[in-house]
Structures are given as C-alpha cells and as structure tokens.
A protein has these predicted regions:
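Structured, active/binding-site neighborhoods that engage oxygen-rich ligands
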Residues: 1-371
Length: 371
C-alpha cells in the first residue's frame, strides 16, 4: 500500500476501534441497573444491543456516547481544518441538541455551562483555565479521554497538545486527566504513523515526565486558584509522576492495577489502553481482555479500541474473523429504530457510522494531519 493508503487504513481502524469497543463492551457493564449481561456471556462478537434507560435499546451495532462524541470531534476538526475550540464547542452543542439517548445529564449540564458562561479564549491557556466555570467533572474521570483519538490528526505538535488541554477544559479539567489525555493522543498519532510498540512506549514515558514537570511549574496553581481541583491534594511533580508512571509501568509490565477507584477512571482507562497495546497480538485479543477486566469496561474498551485500531489498522483487524464480523455489524447497523419494536431508540443520523462516512473521514483527517 502507498503511504496514504497505510495511514487512512489506520485512521479507519482507529474510528472502528472506538465503535467496536463501545458496542462490544457496553452490554457487559457490571451494573445490573444498566442492563448488564454477565461477562461470562462475552463471545467476542457484537450480539447484544446497548441499553438506554430502563427499557430502551439501540439496534445491535449502534454504539454509545464514545463513538458519537468521537464523530462530533472529527466533524469539528474537518470543518475547521484543524482544531478550533469554539467550533468544537459548537459541534458538542449540536450533539446535545439532537437529544441523542447517549447524552448524559452531567455532560449536557457541563457543556451548556461552557457555552453560556465562557468568553472566546485568548491565545494563552491560562486565560482559558481562569474562565472555565466550575463543574462536577473537575476530577480524574475518563469522559474527555473517550473522545480523544481524533486529536491525533492535528499536525502541529504544540497545537495538538493545547487541543488536549482545551478538550479537558470542557468537561474534565484535572491535571491527571490532562496529562493522560496528552500522552494517549501522542501514542495514537505514533501508532497511525506506523511506529513500533517499543518506540511508542519509550516516547510516552518521556512525555509523561515532561508533562508532569510542565504542570507542576505552570498550571497547578492556576487550576487550584480557580477551584478546579481539590485543594487538599498536592498535585506536585512527584505526585503526578508517581500516579501516572505507576499505571503506565504497570501496564507495560503486565501487572494488575486497581480498577475500582471511581475517582481515577482516567488513569484506569489509560492503563487499559497501554496494557492492551503492549501485551496483545491482535485487536480482538486486546479488546476482549479489557472488557473482561470489568470496571468501566465499555468506556475502557472504546479508548483501548481507538489506540489498538490505530496501531493495527483496518486490514489487519479484518484478518480476525470475529473482528471482521464486528466491523460489518458496526458499519451496517440500522441507525433508525424498528417502528414495530417501540422499545428501540434511534441514533441521530449525523453520528451514524457508515462505510461511506468512514472512508470520507479517514481521507479528510489524512490531509489535515499531514500524516
């Protein structure tokens, strides 16, 4: 394949990975309240719908908020020929206004606060941080990381880094979440560009140390001053390095990590992505391993799927019979609800992942990203 074909293949893998992770993981969430199906029934093939509310379901192959917000961000990047914070907020607002069943109340509330209260940011990130209204997501959760993969297509290194911070400003402005965001996006970009696992891990380790130091000296006082992070937590260089490097090294060495602490969902997802990257020989093996670990397994599977898909690419993914079947299920799923089955709900057409849309998005991101 030519360079363009190789890169667009990996970009398609990235997008498909997010969608498959969502569809495959969500039905097996441990919460019975959300209609979770026991993990023992995981076959590796998408065969259950995602439950929305008590009695409503998507059609099989329709993913949740992970893939919808990923597509919304892709649309924003393509329209802006790069990352534009205001346009990104606009596309997130459109997503909310579609009344998609996947829009969570807290996410909706926080994005609406941003749109209602925040002026257009200046070129300085400090001004942006000071202007963001306080919200419930000022903690190390994974709600920003789940939509992060498209940021890897941004060509300029510093613009890409700032885009990660801007994204976290919308819903998850926490030092841990921001650093995990930056490192994960760099890993996805390196995977898209065809770098080896060994090189990706080496560079990510260096980036973690660099970003922990940056935040220790430049950002933490601003965040704490804006009441965005708990003031009783010492977000020093040593604290950040300890927490993030411990998860990163545990993943790379195949060691277990605590998956039950709700305040550290972002690090858990970060851990899952790098565990699967370093210890899986195929997309299918990696994604099933993460789902079986429990915890926030649908979001973890989507985030992991984005990185694995970027690394393996669509053509290699399709060499596995289960993954090939899942790809066909996702891109051929019916977006509209079955009118004869009133408990089935529709996805907004804007976020439906068809073969045609997948090809167009990958080609557009290739051009924008100078990949």
């Amino acid at each position: 394949m030519s360079k363009e074909q190789c890169v667009t293949d990996r970009l398609q893998g990235m997008i498909l990975g997010v969608g498959i992770g969502s569809c495959l993981g969500a039905p097996h969430r441990p919460s019975v309240r959300k209609g979770g199906i026991h993990i023992d029934k995981l076959t590796g093939v998408i065969s259950h719908p995602i439950t929305v509310g008590k009695n409503c379901h998507f059609n099989i192959g329709i993913g949740g908020d992970c893939i919808e917000m990923t597509i919304a961000l892709i649309q924003s990047i393509i329209q802006s020929d790069g990352y534009d914070y205001c346009n990104d907020r606009y596309h997130k607002s459109i997503w909310i206004e579609t009344n998609s069943p996947t829009v969570g109340d807290t996410t909706k509330r926080n994005i609406e606060k941003i749109n209602n209260n925040m002026a257009i940011p200046t070129s300085k990130i400090e001004a942006l941080i000071k202007g963001v209204p306080l919200n419930e997501y000022s903690r190390a959760s994974n709600g920003a990381l789940l939509r992060a993969t498209p940021l890897a297509s941004i060509a300029d290194d510093e613009e890409r880094r700032l885009a990660c911070i801007y994204e976290c400003c919308i819903t998850h402005l926490n030092p841990i979440a921001v650093i995990c965001h930056i490192v994960f996006v760099e890993a996805v970009r390196m995977a898209i560009c065809g770098y080896s696992k060994k090189y990706i891990i080496k560079r990510c380790s260096e980036i973690i140390l660099k970003e922990c130091k940056n935040f220790d000296t430049q950002m933490i006082s601003l965040m704490i001053g804006s009441s965005f992070v708990e003031t009783n937590t010492n977000y020093s260089y040593e604290f950040l390095k300890k927490e993030i490097m411990y998860a990163f090294n545990s993943a790379c060495k195949g060691k277990e990590y605590d998956m039950n602490n709700r305040e550290f969902r972002c690090i858990q997802s970060f851990y899952c992505a790098f565990l699967a990257l370093t210890h899986s020989d195929s997309f299918q093996d990696g994604i099933e391993t993460i789902i079986r670990m429990g915890g926030d397994n649908d979001t973890n599977a989507s985030i992991t799927g984005g990185l694995l898909g970027a690394y393996f690419g669509r053509k290699i993914m399709e060499c596995d019979t289960k993954t090939l079947e899942n790809i066909q299920i996702v891109i051929n799923a019916e977006a509209d609800a079955n009118e004869e089955l009133s408990e089935y709900v529709s996805r907004p057409p804007l976020y439906h992942l068809s073969e045609e849309k997948l090809i167009k998005m990958s080609k557009d991101l290739y051009v924008i990203g100078l990949l």
